[in-house]
Amino acid sequence: VNPIPKKVSVVSTGVANVASVLAAFRRLGVEPQEISRPEQVEQAEWLVLPGVGAFAAAMRAIEERALAGALRARIEAARPTLAICLGLQLLASSSEESPGVSGLGIWSEQIVRLSAERVPQLGWNRVVASANSRFLETGYAYYANSFCLQTEPAGWTASWTDHEGKLVAAVEQDAVLACQFHPELSGPWGERLLANWLGGGRC
């Protein structure tokens, strides 16, 4: 993968370990910066919203830092944004994990608990890329999730995976990409995905 000189900003709210995300971009020749203020979200050239842990704690951290409005405005304007794992789930209206807690509401869909016997989904699983995907190719990605998005939001392009039932692996619209899996932990395949996102599409 060719190094791509871009300014990448990673949202750091204290509830997600961003070290592996930062390291993944450094491997691409990009020096990312951690940010935590709304004006930084607005000004970011390329923005990453990582997420690990509980839906409610992540939304509380976002709201305490007054980031929700800036994140919504950025995504609705289709500015380059990558949401990872819980980051994807935060774009929904709500989650079964945290009843009564609102998400960012980019989509009307609710995040639901995996119906599989094996929960969480932990490890490698196949991603079947949409033929219309700008960023993904079919391959294997690393997952760590107990909740998921099961339906494709209107106006978005979904790629899929199967964990004792079909679920959304990633959704994209213009320069916005949200992945349930961890591209930063998905080896060369994940590295290509990050490079594709930075480059505006598959090479």
Briefly describe each language-model feature range.
Residues 152-153, 162-202:
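A glycine-centered loop/beta-turn motif at secondary-structure junctions
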Residues 53-122:
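Cysteine-nucleophile active-site neighborhood
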Residues 93-165:
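Pocket-forming structural segment of enzyme catalytic cores
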Residues 15, 51-53:
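Short glycine-/small-residue-rich Rossmann-like dinucleotide-binding loops
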Residues 32-43:
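Short acidic low-complexity segments
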Residues 8-30, 183-184:
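N-terminal beta1-alpha1 ligand-phosphate binding loop
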Residues 41-51:
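Short acidic/histidine-rich motifs immediately flanking catalytic phosphotransfer sites
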Residues 31, 46, 80-82, 140:
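Structural signature of beta-strand start/N-cap positions in the alpha/beta core
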